[in-house]
């Protein structure tokens, strides 16, 4: 379409999908922006302070390097119901006011169930990916920015989580990102 893109998170569900987006943007000479709206505020989500003094402190080297940053996604208990899917959902009739095929978009077709579609859609791999892809970036993006890692990626990612269901997202206990430096 020859247009620049302003994309809301999550950009893609897989690294491969993300690489294809980058390739298409480069091939077409377009501008692409993945929105994380806290970048346009004085304070980032969960920091409790303005960004620039903290960025200046880190950039000064006074804290040394490498830094270890620990973030926690401690939120209200009810949010966890939105982030965790259920396996073995029974098919239900599609409500008359819902165009289910339109709602699914490019996601694989699965029988309708209210838990899969409405507020709790975040708990299913086909549509979101749970708390990590829904709210995780709000915690991780400030760290990427503050550490000057916007143009790089971790070289190692370690996950402590129970085995995940192929369809329904489960709990993530701990994720460790290691960068080259």
Task: Pin down the residues of each PLM region.
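Rossmann-like NAD(P)H-binding beta-loop-alpha module
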Residues: 42-103
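Structural recognition of the beta-strand scaffold that forms the well-ordered cores
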Residues: 6-7, 12-13, 31-34, 67-71, ...
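Beta-strand-loop-alpha-helix segment that lines the small-molecule cofactor/substrate pocket
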Residues: 1-42, 59
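Rossmann-like dinucleotide-binding domain that binds NAD(P)(H)
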Residues: 93-94, 101-181
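Secondary-structure transition/capping motifs at alpha-helix termini
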Residues: 2, 24-31, 60-64, 147-153, ...
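Short, surface-exposed recognition loops and adjoining beta-strand edges that mediate ligand/DNA contacts
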Residues: 37-38, 42-44, 72-80, 157-172
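Stable alpha-helical elements in mature extracytoplasmic
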Residues: 1, 17, 50, 96-99, ...
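Active-site-proximal cap/loop segments of hydrolase catalytic domains
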Residues: 18, 46, 51, 79, ...
